[in-house]
Amino acid sequence: MFMFNFDNGHDPNRPSFFEMLNQHQMMPSFKPALKYIFTVLSQRNPKFRYIVNYYDECFYSLLLLLEYHYLKYYEGSFSENFYNLKRIKPRNNNANGDGDTLFSLLKRLVVTPSNAGQGPETYTKSQILKKSFAMIRRNRAAASSSQQAKDDLNTMIQDSDRKESLIYLVLIPYFKGKLDEYYKKESDPLAELGLVSSDNNNNNNDNINDQIQQLEEQIQQQQTIVNGNNNSNNNNKKLKIKFLILIRFLKGSKTLKKLKTIFLKVYPFISAIYEALFFIYQLLYLYEYTNYYTPFFHFQNIQLKRLNHKDIESHRVVISNRRRDRINFVRDWPGSSFFVRLVSILDSILDYSKYILPLSVFIFKSLEWWYSENRISAPTLPIPTPPTPSKRAPGGLEIPRDKRLCPLCLKERTNPTICGSGFVFCYPCIFGYVNEHSKCPITFLPTNTEQLRKIYETV
């Protein structure tokens, strides 16, 4: 796993590509797993249905708190700390061999004049690219020659870096997921044919109209009461009516429909550029042409390094001091023993969440697999014998000896249809009889046309 870091002249604290890949995919893999757990729980307890309906908002709200906690006390995100990584901010990019990255390489290719092939030294753009890659490797080898000097050039992330990191870790993935979901829903062929979206829009408009009507009726009922509280309530309801009218207007506006059409045409290209940019950075990181695994790290000028013993000890000191300060803060409160226990439990949950969360998902999936295996391997009961066929009622039609004949028309059956009593007739014959008499012509058992079932026979 770490074999890419054993080469001579390389930074031993630089995470391998597989470490970066695993930590980058860790949190997105938790999201569907946790949603599945709450979906199963909501089927047994309706209280969890609210979490399922607003799962994205609940998930990213908790993720915001979790990531802030780890960025503040562990110098890295939840998944980065799980793989013993930390965020550092290099003071000098060139000293770390990152001055020549994707942007500088593109600049060299784009800014290269068209007459670059003329003169005493003729270089094509492919040669410039090769020389740029060679320069990157030389800079990296020179920078890693003195590890102590390299550590002095790094500094811890600040509060501004943590806030900016929360935008890239939580807000952007949230809005990206919402845009993907909206595009998938609106680009559905059924929605384009008006079989999905139009019905939803009509239902939404009907709900808005009903809400407006209910609010107007409530205002009229309270018009006769002169009270300051009632007046304030009426004002709030009037504002809500105006807001609902605005929503109804926006949903039916042509401008919004044009913007929606433009979005459906442009968003696939924007999403492709977004994914391609991540792929290019990951490819460059794999071949050690950059120390930035994602463009977000490049925008922030932040790199990931492995934790050393000094970092782990400093984290322990910070955590112990934090717990002591919080306990001392609530010790003077009334009922301090309860709050002291609560603070200790919350701190333990946050600090050990990197073990609790994966373990809980693993245990749940293991239990699900165990019970599903038991259901599959459990002895199955024998198939119950079919009930005996109904007997002919006195005065009922005779059953023909030739099974291919219809008891009603006494001709070979066409479009065979079975009745609730178990006898087969022609569809036109049995439909007309049941529609008129509401009973089986042989057994006189009550039936209706909805209980008739067509049979498709093989030739």
UniProtKB/Swiss-Prot annotation:
GO cellular component, one term: peroxisomal importomer complex
ZnF locations on chain (RING-type): 406-444
Record pathway: Protein modification; protein ubiquitination
Signal peptide interval: none
TM spans (from-to): 17-44, 48-72, 159-196, 249-287, 356-380
InterPro entries: PEX12, Pex_N, Znf_RING/FYVE/PHD
Cytoplasmic side: 45-47, 197-248, 381-459
GO BP of this protein: protein import into peroxisome matrix; protein monoubiquitination
Upper classification of the organism: Eukaryota, Amoebozoa, Evosea, Eumycetozoa, Dictyostelia
Compartments, record wording: Peroxisome membrane
Residues where Zn(2+) binds: C406, C409, C426, C429
Free-text function comment from the UniProt entry: Component of a retrotranslocation channel required for peroxisome organization by mediating export of the PEX5 receptor from peroxisomes to the cytosol, thereby promoting PEX5 recycling. The retrotranslocation channel is composed of PEX2, PEX10 and PEX12; each subunit contributing transmembrane segments that coassemble into an open channel that specifically allows the passage of PEX5 through the peroxisomal membrane. PEX12 also regulates PEX5 recycling by activating the E3 ubiquitin-protein ligase activity of PEX10.
Annotated protein name in UniProt: Putative peroxisome assembly protein 12
Keywords of this entry: Membrane, Metal-binding, Peroxisome, Protein transport, Transmembrane, Transmembrane helix, Transport, Ubl conjugation pathway, Zinc, Zinc-finger
Subunit structure: Component of the PEX2-PEX10-PEX12 retrotranslocation channel.
